[in-house]
Amino acid sequence: MSRLFVFILIALFLSAIIDVMSNFKVEGACSKPCRKYCIDKGARNGKCINGRCHCYY
């Protein structure tokens, strides 16, 4: 019984960590409009990929 309880606690802990990390990633998305930011820098286009703005020259 105690092994099951420990397993459930570990599963809940890992679930909470994954939930927090996924929320952080959503909030960490590109804060600026990438296309406009990149065009202003002289690039032809820009896209937000994995929370970072990538410019295409």
Swiss-Prot record:
Domain of life: Eukaryota
Disulfide bridge map: 30-48, 34-53, 38-55
Tissue specificity: Expressed by the venom gland.
Site (described: Basic residue of the functional dyad): 47
Principal location: secreted
Signal peptide interval: 1-22
InterPro entries, sorted: Scorpion_toxin-like_sf, Scorpion_toxinS_K_inh
Subcellular localization, as worded in the UniProt entry: Secreted
Site positions for Aromatic residue of the functional dyad: 56
Domain notes: Has the structural arrangement of an alpha-helix connected to a beta-sheet by disulfide bonds (CSalpha/beta).
Family membership noted in the UniProt record: Belongs to the short scorpion toxin superfamily. Potassium channel inhibitor family. Alpha-KTx 26 subfamily.
Protein name as annotated: Potassium channel toxin alpha-KTx 26.1
